[in-house]
Design a protein with these regions (language model features):
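Short, small/polar-rich loop/turn modules that mediate ligand/substrate recognition or access, typified
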Residues: 128, 133, 185-187, 193
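Alpha-helical segment proximal to the catalytic Tyr-Lys
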Residues: 81, 125-129, 183
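Active-site helix of classical SDR
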Residues: 76, 112, 120
């Protein structure tokens, strides 16, 4: 898809929740691209392990926080040095309506995404002087594998536009935030949720 759009892409399989794998993957990429740096980072990893808090297992809590929050820390810290030294970078973190509103049965997911929003706002202030922007996109209910088991017809009644969003609509928001036109936007959370607010 990237090549069809005139860009280039590489697949780098690794587990974003494991710090050693993140370090190795980024080191390998940097070794193969000595003149380049990762100028745009979209922290898009996410999993859900929904359950009421009283029934939630330790693994359900830890796996969600490791994938949704710790991966942000591992990857962002690793690529940030080059962004700062080159004085240009774009970081977009995929948050969620759950991180803004909090949803029952998703205490783990809501906690991870809310923390990601806080980290976005804090880091944006740390790196703005070096022309690195840090923003978040908070999707609502988007038609993906992650939402296919949810009761869509019931949920659509709560969404003012009356439908689930499309992945392309989320991608458009991300595309704007990584563009030169968004250079004066940092520390923001853009909701893509069809008008579903708290």
């Amino acid at each position: 898809l990237a090549e069809e759009a005139g860009g280039q892409a590489e697949l780098m399989p690794f587990d974003v929740s494991v710090q050693a794998e993140v370090e190795a993957a980024v080191d390998n990429w940097q070794d193969a691209h000595k003149e380049d740096y990762i100028a745009v980072l979209v922290n898009n990893a996410g999993i859900r392990r929904d359950n009421l808090m009283i029934f939630m297992q330790d693994d359900d809590w830890n796996n969600v926080l490791n994938t949704n929050l710790n991966s942000f820390f591992f990857l962002t810290r690793r690529v940030l040095k080059n962004m700062l030294s080159k004085r240009w970078g774009r970081i977009v973190n995929m948050a969620s309506l759950s991180g803004i509103k909090g949803l029952p049965g998703q205490t783990n997911y809501s906690a991870a995404k809310a923390a990601l929003i806080g980290a976005t706002k804090a880091l944006a202030q740390e790196v703005a002087a070096r022309k690195v922007t840090v923003n978040a996109v908070a999707p609502g209910f988007i038609a993906t594998d992650m939402t296919k088991e949810l009761p869509e017809e019931e949920l659509k009644k709560m969404i003012p536009v009356g439908r689930f969003g499309k992945p392309e609509e989320v991608a458009s928001a991300v595309g704007f935030l990584v563009s030169d036109e968004a250079a004066y936007i940092t520390g923001e959370v853009i909701s893509v949720n069809g008008g579903l607010y708290t």
